[in-house]
A protein has these predicted regions:
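Specific register positions within alpha-helical solenoid repeats of the TPR/Sel1-like families, i.e.
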Residues: 1-4, 35-36, 66-75, 113, ...
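Short solvent-exposed coil/turn linkers within tandem alpha-helical repeat scaffolds
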Residues: 2-9, 16-29, 33-40, 49-60, ...
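Short pre-active-site segment immediately N-terminal to redox-active cysteine/selenocysteine motifs
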Residues: 145-147, 152-156, 187, 220
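Conserved redox-active cysteine motifs that mediate thiol-disulfide chemistry
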Residues: 151-168
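Thiol-based oxidoreductase modules, predominantly thioredoxin-like and allied folds used
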Residues: 176-190, 200-210
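Thiol/disulfide oxidoreductase modules built on the thioredoxin-like
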Residues: 196-201, 206-250
Length: 253
């Protein structure tokens, strides 16, 4: 009953926004809060706010909200172009509006960076750092090889399962020209301990300062990037069967 009541309250809020409050100067943050919803009807309401609210700042917040909701519709070029258009509008109209400890402008610029640098078909950044042995290492040293770049941490959600999936991937493809490279912000002592007991037999970046995580805009763990021989991104997502299918398809070429 509580869940049904929550849904009913949310529906009433959206309906009130659609019919009464869409021109209010105070609904910008509400539009951003609605980005967690995947209902197309909600996007239409936010689009109404963007088009008809008299405040440029509210229009900009609505533009950012629309761009974030479009993110869930895939990486089709037309969708990407629409997202960039809304993000640019957000930067122009609401660049100084604060959202938590950041601003609309920073959020929008970050999303544009991801679209232009961290989507399928783009060349991945050349992560540079040191591995668990303290040796200098960078992705470009592996040019010509398929790379599975896996961001993980011992305290991530379902860590045991995630590391098990990565271990299986390493076992299946490690001898077939595929390099599994981990990136973790765990302490160097923890990383070396896991290497010593063979829990993580693959090579890992030690990223205690989070620089590589920031470079790849990592927000949730685990996350895997599959890169081809030219370091172009072919898959982004969690470890599991889709990683295997992507790797198999690339090895078959």
């Amino acid at each position: 009953r509580e869940e049904g009541s929550a849904v009913s309250r949310a529906a009433r809020i959206v309906e009130a926004l659609r019919t009464v409050h869409y021109q209010s100067a105070r609904v910008g943050m509400l539009c951003l809060a609605l980005t967690s919803q995947s209902d197309p009807a909600i996007m239409k309401v936010v689009e109404k706010v963007e088009a008809q609210n008299p405040s440029g700042e509210v229009q900009g917040q609505a533009s950012l909200a629309i761009a974030m909701m479009l993110k869930g519709l895939g990486d089709d070029p037309e969708i990407m172009e629409k997202r960039i258009g809304h993000l640019r509008s957000a930067i122009i109209k609401a660049h100084e509006v604060e959202v938590g400890d950041t601003t609309v402008s920073k959020l929008a610029m970050d999303e544009i960076f991801i679209i232009q640098n961290l989507t399928k078909g783009r060349t991945a950044p050349d992560a540079i750092g040191r591995d668990s042995s303290g040796e200098p290492f960078k992705l470009s040293m592996l040019k010509g090889k398929v790379i599975v770049l896996a961001f993980w941490h011992t305290r991530m959600r379902e860590a045991e399962r995630g590391l098990s999936l990565l271990s299986k991937l390493h076992e299946q493809h490690g001898q077939r020209g595929v390099d599994l490279i981990g990136v973790t912000s765990d302490s160097l002592a923890v990383l070396r301990g896991l290497r010593a007991n063979n829990t993580i037999p693959w090579r890992n970046f030690s990223d205690e300062d989070g620089r590589i995580h920031s470079q790849f805009r990592v927000r949730d763990l685990p996350i895997v990037y599959v890169l081809d021989a030219e370091r172009k991104i072919r898959y982004i997502g969690g470890p599991g069967s889709f990683v295997d299918l992507t790797v198999e398809g690339m090895l078959a070429k």
